[in-house]
């Protein structure tokens, strides 16, 4: 039995080959969750793991204007799928602790489980949450939220350093040699503790679906300028000789918060992840650490995404994105 692990979200992928003379399907119980046919002009075709798993791992967040409070961790679930018509599935093994397509030598040498932080510049904040969706055997869209702090609190000392926890969600893929090769996928949670981790200065965090259907976050470490847009609908009343009455009255008033911030200078690789994942994401939420309810998830829409670039003689450059976004929902007042 060969066992490998895939970090969540699926920034790294796996593939296995299917001969051209075999049809292919993936089942969960009696339900077909993915189908594919080999290409006619090749001897084999590649089936990618992300195509099978993205519907199970992509988050289904529900956040109303009243906000959504972060819940405690629930019991993790596991499920199994089977690949039919394949005799010896071959996997393209990639380093599962790597968040990008480059080798993370620090994690390779010093850690066996990696760290689960936002993938752009690996900065993390104790108030950040990690939403994960898994299949529990009955419902695909079970999910839980966490505030990842040691024993529910942040431990500090005179040096203003903090002991924090890094959650690691792994997917274990085990091809088993039966009549049909099965792929068992266990969504498990392991927690490791670094000795010290300085608490970063940050104002909030963005949570978004990446291009693989997984869930990522980006820590906003610079000032956030907040404003409120107020729109009013009014109606004209008839002539009234009583001075205390209003000739022009408002029927309803709507309020929508707007925010402005920037990412700071990012490298080319970090900028690529922002551009291809955050700015084009179909679902984005904002958590305001300094708001009235720091545990609230706010659905937002980007309204402006300008950037400035520093270019150097070695042809490399740094990019700073100016982000402006609004709450996706309005608040109404009579």
Residue ranges and their predicted role:
Residues 1-199:
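Preference for solvent-exposed, low-hydrophobicity sequence contexts
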Residues 133, 188-334:
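Extracellular/virion structural assembly segments
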């Amino acid at each position: 039995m060969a066992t490998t692990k895939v970090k969540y979200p699926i920034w790294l992928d796996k593939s296995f080959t299917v001969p051209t003379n075999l049809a292919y399907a993936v089942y969960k119980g009696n339900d077909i969750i993915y189908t594919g046919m080999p290409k006619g002009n090749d001897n084999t075709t590649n089936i990618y793991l992300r195509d099978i798993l993205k519907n199970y791992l992509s988050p289904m967040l529900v956040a109303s204007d009243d906000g959504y409070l972060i819940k405690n961790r629930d019991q993790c679930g596991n499920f199994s799928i089977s690949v039919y018509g394949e005799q010896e599935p071959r996997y393209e093994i990639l380093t599962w602790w790597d968040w990008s397509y480059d080798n993370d030598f620090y994690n390779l040498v010093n850690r066996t489980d990696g760290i689960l932080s936002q993938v752009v510049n690996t900065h993390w904040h104790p108030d950040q949450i990690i939403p994960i969706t898994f299949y529990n055997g009955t419902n695909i869209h079970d999910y839980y939220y966490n505030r990842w702090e040691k024993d529910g609190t942040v431990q500090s000392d005179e040096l203003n350093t903090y002991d924090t926890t890094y959650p690691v969600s792994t997917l274990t893929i085990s091809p088993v040699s039966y009549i049909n090769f099965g792929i068992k996928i266990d969504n498990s949670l392991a927690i490791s503790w670094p000795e010290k981790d300085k608490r970063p200065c940050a104002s909030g965090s963005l949570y978004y679906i990446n291009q693989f259907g997984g869930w990522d976050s980006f820590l906003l470490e610079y000032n956030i300028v907040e404003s409120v847009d107020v729109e009013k609908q009014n109606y004209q009343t008839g002539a009234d000789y009583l001075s205390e009455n209003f000739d022009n009255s408002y029927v309803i008033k709507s309020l929508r918060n707007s925010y402005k911030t920037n990412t700071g200078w990012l490298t080319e690789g970090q900028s690529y992840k922002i551009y291809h994942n955050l700015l084009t994401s179909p679902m984005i939420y904002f958590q305001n650490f300094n708001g009235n309810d720091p545990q609230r998830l706010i659905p937002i829409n980007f309204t402006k995404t300008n950037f400035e670039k520093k270019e150097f003689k070695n042809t490399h450059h740094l990019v700073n994105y100016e982000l402006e976004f609004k709450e996706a929902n309005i608040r109404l007042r009579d």
